[in-house]
Amino acid sequence: MQIFVKTLTGKTITLEVEPSDTIENVKAKIQDKEGIPPDQQRLIFAGKQLEDGRTLSDYNIQKESTLHLVLRLRGGAKKRKKKNYSTPKKIKHKRKKVKLAVLKYYKVDENGKIHRLRRECPGENCGAGVFMAAHEDRHYCGKCNLTFVFSKPEEK
């Protein structure tokens, strides 16, 4: 029986085959006519790629059917290298949770009276509970940048 093979260039080749012929035999006949090696050939019929071990009758290829020949693509995506870091990644700082941390701001004396150890910021932007940092020579509010500097008597 006669089948047609349409190449990528649009040229149609006529082949004389039998329904019992394998796809490998068809590819060998295409190599004889066109010079394309069988390992680079891909034959498509009815939207399916034809496998080498099967016969034309397995795919229901009848007389005057048209197969489409496309070339196999070599290679693929370029292999990417895994990044190697010379220095280890910096560990993100985790804030330490201290239970009952508010107790360090207050002190209870022997009479049961509560005294503040830190000064609250009197600024309008800062509400109640915003304490000023106690430095050696000043109190400083980190929220509104208010600073109270202590004046020490000069030693003579």
UniProtKB/Swiss-Prot annotation:
ZnF (C4-type) residues: 121-144
Family matches, as InterPro entries: Ribosomal_eS31 (IPR002906), Ribosomal_eS31_euk-type_sf (IPR038582), Ribosomal_zn-bd (IPR011332), Ubiquitin-like_dom (IPR000626), Ubiquitin-like_domsf (IPR029071), Ubiquitin_CS (IPR019954), Ubiquitin_dom (IPR019956), Ubiquitin_ubiquitin-like (IPR050158)
Gene3D superfamilies: 6.20.50.150, Phosphatidylinositol 3-kinase Catalytic Subunit, Chain A, domain 1 (3.10.20.90)
Miscellaneous section: In Drosophila ubiquitin is encoded by 3 different genes. RpL40 and RpS27A genes code for a single copy of ubiquitin fused to the ribosomal proteins eL40 and eS31, respectively. Ubi-p63E gene codes for a polyubiquitin precursor with exact head to tail repeats. For a better understanding, features related to ubiquitin are only indicated for the first chain.
Residue(s) of cross-link: Glycyl lysine isopeptide (Gly-Lys) (interchain with K-? in acceptor proteins): 76
Listed SMART domains: Ribosomal_S27, UBQ
Name of the protein this chain belongs to: Ubiquitin-ribosomal protein eS31 fusion protein
Molecular-function GO terms, alphabetical: protein tag activity; structural constituent of ribosome; ubiquitin protein ligase binding; zinc ion binding
Domain of life, per lineage: Eukaryota
Family the entry assigns: In the N-terminal section; belongs to the ubiquitin family. In the C-terminal section; belongs to the eukaryotic ribosomal protein eS31 family.
All copies of domain Ubiquitin-like, residue ranges: 1-76
Residues annotated as site: Essential for function: 68
Positions bearing the Glycyl lysine isopeptide (Lys-Gly) (interchain with G-Cter in ubiquitin) cross-link: 48
Hydrolase keyword on record: no
Site residues (Interacts with activating enzyme), renumbered to this chain: 54, 72
Keywords noted in UniProt: Cytoplasm, Isopeptide bond, Metal-binding, Nucleus, Ribonucleoprotein, Ribosomal protein, Ubl conjugation, Zinc, Zinc-finger
Gene Ontology BP terms: cytoplasmic translation; modification-dependent protein catabolic process; protein ubiquitination; ribosomal small subunit biogenesis
Gene Ontology cellular component annotations, sorted alphabetically: cytoplasm; cytosol; cytosolic ribosome; cytosolic small ribosomal subunit; nucleolus; nucleoplasm; nucleus; small-subunit processome
